[in-house]
Amino acid sequence: MAPHRSRQRNPRFKLWRYDDEPLAIAETMPELRHLKLFGNGLTNLRLEAILDNCVHLVHLDLRRCFNINLLGDLEKRCSERIRDLRRPDDSTADSPFDASSDIYSAGEDDYDFYSDDSDGTLSDHFEECKTVSVATGNESVYVLSFVRSDNFIYPKKIASSSSLSSTPLPSLMKDKKLRNWAELPSKLTSSILLRLGAIEILQNAQKVCKPWHRVCKDPSMWRKIDIDNRNDRAAFKYDLESMCRHAVDRSHGGLIEIEIWYYGTNDLIMYIADRSSNLKSLGLVRCFPITDEGVAKAVSKVPLLEYLEVSYCLFSGESLRDIGRSCPNLKTLKLNRAPEIMFSNSGFDDNAKAIAESMPELRHLQLLGNGLTNKGLNAILDGCPHLEHLDLRQCFNINLVGDLKKRCFERIKDLRCPNDSDDDSDDGSDNGAVTTFGSQFNETDYHWY
């Protein structure tokens, strides 16, 4: 009998969206013998890649992989190569992730994420259904099993060469003596989960099981916060500012590094600064609501800061001087694509002069699209004697000729000139991501239990 469903429903999500996991398997796991991709969205092309690279594969489960079309040469190749082949339309009756489950959904159907009922029955059932077998990208991995739930992969069991070296693989598979990931040591679990972003941890990973939830609440998990919404439009459905505040609270003052794209505000960076006296790295990219005064005020509370990146924010020379005086250890400054609303050459050089006067310890300076002139550049070279990396791309008021050109090339180890390509810049200048935010965020979702 299906567990009782609470009437309250959270948003619905599509199960399968990506084809990159099979490619990663093909590229990094040549020793695979057993591969289960139950309900995966891989295509024929990715299946070919797996067959090309996983040359020892003998068991392949493709049930509910409805993007696969096993016909012609591909069908022949699979049948000849794979000893135990489960096809997309084969029965799932023997699978613990049977498509008839009240929570599991097959094909392109929507997936319902229900809230807990009063006695917790549904929570236990859902936790059981969404835990799956998975292995990390290790060349010695023999057994790998993926079952997709929402857009997140939940691991449960793993077997690698270290655990199989003294046990014949078929015997081990028969007895199902695989490691339960919920029983892994906390340090190892933490090491694995740290590879996820904050969104994945708060929205998914901490809800897998109680041991993972405990690890996800540990302050050591929040030394670095990167709520990366650059290439994921789905991320904008969340209240990212509230999510960021919650992540900062979990750090308990231990936050070292944070990067914010689009959703930063003066209030948010002040909230971070008030609770993160050990902060050493702060990135604010395309956070249009912030002001130079707001950044300077927040930065004054984090004197250990060594790295600061701000883009699309107009800075006055005085605000930059305040930052330099507040952060004597500042080694890297990225001040990119400031709005060009100043018109005189002296105004263009205000930032350069402030940097030269207040940031003598700089090693890395990036000024993409800045309006400084040769005079401002000379001031920086005079005032920042340790400068090794200087990025002047799209600084078209600079004329690198004669003595100035010679001085730059002799002094600067890594020099990017005004006309150099900026294709590799990572300041969001060509990112077309939507800059409006949703609010599908519930603080209780993060605490869970």
Swiss-Prot record:
Q: Is Repeat included in the keywords of this UniProt record? A: yes
LRR repeat residues: 14-37, 39-64, 261-286, 287-311, 312-337, 344-367, 369-394, 401-427
CDD domains xref list: F-box_AtSKIP19-like
Pfam annotation, one family: F-box-like
The record ties this protein, via SUPFAM superfamilies, to: RNI-like (SSF52047)
Chain segments annotated as coiled-coil in the UniProt record: none
Domain F-box intervals? 178-225
Q: Which molecular-function annotation in GO is an example for this chain?
A: SCF ubiquitin ligase complex binding
Keywords from UniProt, A to Z, are: Leucine-rich repeat, Repeat
Protein's recorded name: Putative F-box/LRR-repeat protein 23
Organism expressing this protein natively: Arabidopsis thaliana (Mouse-ear cress)
